[in-house]
């Protein structure tokens, strides 16, 4: 039984293990199949599927539901809304908007409206061409002209009113103008004139006192200028009539004045002649031949600008104007044109040079077309007689000088009319050399300068320039482009010292003599020599136990500087010796100082090596012999707790101790007032205030703390802090790179240099100088 039971237990175990292994394999296959299905589904999104295959595939509809966000509710404002009411439009604005709309919409797709509009537009342009036939003929105008000039000036109507009447008669039908133009030989009687000009009986009886009212300008009485012309379309219409029927009239203000003063003139007197019709006033009568060109039957201009007449020929031309038959009538007597005379531009062909001495004036002028006559008249105007008389004598005294001028023609678009004043001689002395180039001095010697369009060159000559002979040596070049004004080594004549000292601020010229060689005088001012200061610097090596501070004595010109931090000496233990425990750390360190002082100048030759008696250094320490010291300037000074000097003026090293007793004498209230005056934050206890003041006095020594008032104390502290930071490259680089600085680290760094300042002072310094700080 036992064997069977044992066999049975072994068979069950075997079968159970087989079943377990089969189950695990099936479960693994199932997991693998599920993994493949999920991976295939993920990769189906990247598969390229056709439209046919996509339709056959049973893909489920995917619905995307958007999550609704809760709308943020705005807080309502308790304000009354403004009613959106537009401004009422006026009727004119409504009509304007209606007419400003697109007008072409009326004609779109409607040919009938276009056809109706175009004929009316074409007929509106016809009257412009039809007006040409309504012009007055020459016969009608001649008849109107005769009647117009026979009437007195006060009773005349202007051309504007006549044209207005003509238009009225044309609109009404046939009027008096057509009736009057039928027969030219028939003259109008009083009744015709009364009907023609619409005059009443009073105006017909009293010619002098009556006046007609028409729309004329208020400046009519100043003078009437009338231009009689016809706007003919072609030249053929101008030559249509004969020469005897054409008349041209010029009326001036002078004619109107004489015509008003003549009371004996008859209104209806008229004379006709075959050669030409004339006007009763003889002063205003102009014949046809005077206003017409004899070469061709063409109308010339009536009004033209009169030509310029020179002043010397004005009287002769006025006499000849009366004798000539076809001359133009002058507007008034003694009228001279303001236009400049016609002058040719300067050219290379013909030019005349005039030389006038004292002052010398060189004038280049062009020649008139008439030759010598115009040149003689211009010479009479420009050159006075006194200059002509003295011309020979001055040529002998002064040497002549001719300056070549540029022959380029000068073209000016507009030449202003100027008068030509005379140049009067002056009795002033010659201008010195130093003042020749100043324009103000030239104006004083030359009163007036010619106003002619030709260019003027002014050349002034001084008597200092005469009889100067310059000899050149072999080394000097005879073709030099410049010669000194103040003399050369081989110059025979020397200038007076007055001329030289006017322009050059140099030393006296007594040293320069004619016998010895003289050099060119410099134009720079003479500089006085200044004495320079001689400073001597001594470098000393001092033990760390000796406390030395920077000091400056401006009175005695002494400066003491301390370089860098204290340097520790390296202890070399060769035999593994244990250092003495009694020796202090102060004995192992040292510092370097530099003393600068001023050395008095000595007439004896300078000696770089000086003895102990000549030295004025602060540290009266005997120097070694020259053989022992050599070129070294460093000395080892034994350490001592504190230096004590015999001189009272050199107590700057312990200046804080002097003020400590003065601080202790002050009361707490007085110390608080001092703190407020200095801009410091006051504290409660007196001991704390004394500690702060002691640290500040040690920091800014040798300045006296009690002598500072206001913000001077802060400025002294800030200046000393800035100097210390610039000497330390680490802190200086951090500040320049705007790196945030912890005030605790800055305070510890100052404490390592035996400077004790509070955090409030450091924070105020950083805020004042824009230095970034941090508390972390």
From Swiss-Prot:
Main location: nucleus
Post-translational modification summary for this protein: Phosphorylated in response to DNA damage.
GO MF terms held by the record: 5'-flap endonuclease activity
Segment forming the signal sequence: none
Pfam family, one: Slx4
An example Gene Ontology CC term for this record: Slx1-Slx4 complex
Biological process according to GO: DNA recombination; DNA repair; DNA replication
Entry's localization field: Nucleus
Biased composition (Acidic residues): 201-217
Region Disordered, residue ranges: 201-223, 263-283, 507-531
Keyword annotations of the record: DNA damage, DNA recombination, DNA repair, Nucleus, Phosphoprotein
Subunit structure: Forms a heterodimer with SLX1.
UniProt similarity note: Belongs to the SLX4 family.
Function in brief: Regulatory subunit of the SLX1-SLX4 structure-specific endonuclease that resolves DNA secondary structures generated during DNA repair and recombination. Has endonuclease activity towards branched DNA substrates, introducing single-strand cuts in duplex DNA close to junctions with ss-DNA.
Name of protein: Structure-specific endonuclease subunit SLX4
Organism: Candida albicans (strain SC5314 / ATCC MYA-2876)
